[in-house]
Structure formats: structure tokens, C-alpha cells
Amino acid sequence: MIGRKNEKESTVMWRMPYTILRNLFRLPKILETLHRMTDQPETYSQQEVYDYVRYIVGLMERTGHVKTNTFGQENLPKEGGYVLFPNHQGQYDAYSLVAAHEGALSLVMDRDRSYFVFVSEIVDALGGKRMDLHNSRQSLTIINQVAKEVAQGRRYILFPEGGYDQDKKNSLWEFKPGSFKAAVKAKAPIVPVVLVDSYQVYNSRRLTPVTTQVHYLPPLYYEEYQTLTTPQIAETVQARIGEKLAQLGCG
């Protein structure tokens, strides 16, 4: 899930207001379109809505001087649902993944951070799930909903670290075993994803160009992990992501 922002994260993020100002004249139309797409699901397919969100992310990247480089697309399963499990660096992570993934995605997000203007519209348009991190019963309900949708063919983003702070950068925190329950229940592929330098987009006072990286690693299929416990799956995925970060010189 997209985790809660740590109190340490107090850096003035100039790129965010700068990007908003450069797109201010577009915002009314964007918000109107997102609301219409959300309110008329019978009119717009999941892919059509997702393509529009990708268009918005493209605007954010062009006007915010951000570029996302993608590697390992050949590792993505060609058919059926799956769950992307990336390391978590900052507020731009989900946008980097949308920029790097052509097929429709949804996501699980911390409920407390999901109702900001524009963020809320994106979450609703993508059919995202809002998880209450302080309510285990509600969290289990969300996991079961995600598992059902993934089994039916949807693809989800779920951040197994559950959070980040300003100092985290390209380092890893412990992956939470419970994050993997949705994929296990759906018997779906688990796709480890490595994000590099995504934190730089909103954790800097400068507006210099930023290039983020998204690396899709080979997936773990159900046949490979069915005998493992969720803590073992978490350790395996974390180790693979950590190894790739080390190979890239950021571990």
C-alpha cells in the first residue's frame, strides 16, 4: 500500500507547486473528466480510464522535468491478474509505476492520505482501495477484495514496506508479510519491482531534472511460492529487490 508520510518529511517540495501552477489552466478539465469517468463506469473501460491517468502523469512529468526509464517489461506476465510489489521511496512512486506500465493498474493506499484533492480523484478513477492501517478487520476486508479482483484479472500495486520517510531514499525497510496475502489468496504472480531515485522528485528543494527508474524483476508464480509462508515470501521478495539495488549501486 502507499504508506503514511513520516513526520520527518518536512522538506519544502517546490516541484509539486511548480507542476500544479504550470498545469493550473488544465486542472478544471482534468478533474471534471476524472469525476465523469468515475461516475460512469459503464461508459469507460478500465483501460480507457487508466490511459487518461497516464496522460495526466505524462503532463506531470513534462511540466515537472521528470523522466521515468523502464526496464524489464518482458518480465511482466502476459495474461491474467498479478500484484506489483515495489520498494517505497516517496509520494511519486505510484506515478512512476503508472508511467512505466501500459496495462491498467489499480492500487492500495493508506486511507488517511487518500482524500487530498487530485489524489482522491486518481484513486477513485483507478478503482483503488483505501486501507485503514489502524483497523485490522477493515484491512483484511480490503485484502480479500483485492484478492478477488486479482483472481478475476486485475493488476494491483501494493507497497510491502508500508511507508517511507525523507531519509529513506534508495534504502529498504522490512517488508510486511501481510502485504502478500492478497496475491497468495488469488494464487497470482508476485512481481518484485525496483524503484530508483523516485524519492528525488518531491524530496528536493531544487527543480533540476530528475530521472527515475522502474525495474520489473522476474515474477514469483504460485507454483514457486505455494509452500512458503508469507514471512518467507516477504523475505524472498525483499532479498531480490535488495540484490538489484546493490547491482545498480544503490543498495
Whereabouts are the PLM-identified features?
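Short acidic-hydrophobic, aromatic-tinged amphipathic segments that line or gate anion-handling sites
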Residues: 70, 129-133, 222
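Short gly/ser/thr-rich secondary-structure transition/capping motifs
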Residues: 63-71, 138-140, 196-198
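Non-catalytic C-terminal accessory region of glycerolipid acyltransferases
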Residues: 2-9, 140-251
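Amphipathic coiled-coil/heptad-repeat helices and related helical stalk/stem segments
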Residues: 69, 90, 115, 139-143, ...
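Membrane-anchoring hydrophobic helices of lipid-metabolizing enzymes
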Residues: 1-82
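Short, well-ordered coil/turn elements that cap or connect secondary structure elements
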Residues: 63-65, 102, 120-125, 185, ...
